[in-house]
Structure formats: structure tokens, C-alpha cells
């Protein structure tokens, strides 16, 4: 899955994001402020808010960093990625400017509600995830494809800390179904690097760590600017 590599690479060294709010334009600088969807909203349950606050405490000493998350890619990031990796005959800048991140394309509370935190020293990324009602598979439970998506997003953040990368393989073992609207912890860690190959492990557990819902391993490949994707 192609992800917003350029934006996330900047984010790993970025300053904390602003509080949520509709995108607006500042008259002084004409700079657009985009809404950060990785901050609490009214659809978040008490459990998700509590976990979020706990991880924000961990961020205070600098060991963890909260990852901002936006609905649309910055235009500059799109242009940079296409310049490096996309053949000119496939570039559609006007259409791409209207593209949205899949996990942030749902109405509030209906899809992927999550906040992501990154630890550079431990090479870990943790997502606090609440699956909304429009992610249903078997009645009452989160669809397996939605679970795979949040795994891909979380492990991908681990991988791109080492450079622009794309998913090559996801190996997922579903152990227990995840109830809709429940809160789970998606914990991923970069295990090893072999050349351009990045190997990442991942688990999904209940917030009390007593239930293991899913185990996964992922392989990502660092992209070579000398080799276009198309």
C-alpha cells in the first residue's frame, strides 16, 4: 500500500501539532492550517481518551512522539514523491490534490479512530485504535480488512523511520475478533534491516493486555529514487 511517506518522514522530526479544528487560512501569512485527526473528538470512548492521556504523558520527556494525522497530503509532499518515484506520463497532479488518506476519509466516529505514537530509541510505533460502526465485518465485529489496514499503517510508520518505503508483504494471524467500538492497542516494532528490506512485527491486544487479538509480521522495501514505481 502506497502511503504518505514524505509527510510522515517530516513528522518524525516535527513539532507537536495544533489542537483540532477545521482547516482555515491565516490572513497574515496565508498559511493553511489542516485539521489533525489524531486528537480526541466526541466519538472517542472513555478508554481511548484515558490511553491517549497516558501516552501524552510519556511524550513529556521526549521518549515518545505523537504523530499528527491529516485527511489530505500536502501538495508539496505529493509533488516530491511523484518527482522521485512516478513516471511523468502517470502524473495527475490535479486529481492527486483531491485525494484523501483512506483511514481519515470516514465521518467522525464511523471509521478508523486512532492516535499513533512513535519511540525512536525503541524503534516502536503504537496505535490506540477504536473501530467505528462502518468497519463491520461479521455482525458486531471489526472487518478483517480494516484490521489489516491499521496494522499496515502502524507497521509502516516503523518502517519509514528508516526511509521512504512501501509494503511488500503482510502476514496476519487473526486469533480473536475485535468488537466494534472497543479500544485496542496496536504495538509494532522494527526487528531487523537487511539491505533495503525492513522487517516489522506487530500485535493487537486489549487495553489490559489480557487478550491477544492479532499477530502479524510485515516486510517493507525502501524505495530507490533511481527506480521509478511505474
Swiss-Prot record:
Transit peptide: 1-27
GO molecular function: long-chain fatty acyl-CoA hydrolase activity
Residues carrying N6-acetyllysine: 65
Reactions listed under catalytic activity: hexadecanoyl-CoA + H2O = hexadecanoate + CoA + H(+); octanoyl-CoA + H2O = octanoate + CoA + H(+); decanoyl-CoA + H2O = decanoate + CoA + H(+); dodecanoyl-CoA + H2O = dodecanoate + CoA + H(+)
GO BP, sorted A to Z: fatty acid metabolic process; negative regulation of phosphatidylinositol 3-kinase/protein kinase B signal transduction; regulation of mitochondrial membrane permeability involved in apoptotic process
Chain residues that bind substrate: 175, 196-197
Database matches in InterPro entries: HotDog_dom_sf, THEM4/THEM5_acyl-CoA_thioest, Thioestr_dom
Keyword annotations from UniProtKB, A to Z: Acetylation, Apoptosis, Cell membrane, Cell projection, Cytoplasm, Fatty acid metabolism, Host-virus interaction, Hydrolase, Lipid metabolism, Membrane, Mitochondrion, Mitochondrion inner membrane, Phosphoprotein, Transit peptide
GO cellular component: cytosol; mitochondrial inner membrane; mitochondrial intermembrane space; mitochondrion; ruffle membrane
Modification sites for Phosphoserine: 28-29
Top-level division of the source organism's lineage: Eukaryota
UniProt EC number: 3.1.2.2
Post-translational modification: Phosphorylated.
SUPFAM superfamilies: Thioesterase/thiol ester dehydrase-isomerase
PANTHER family, alphabetized: ACYL-COENZYME A THIOESTERASE THEM4 (PTHR12418:SF19)
Name the UniProt record assigns to this protein: Acyl-coenzyme A thioesterase THEM4
Name of the gene this protein is made from: Them4
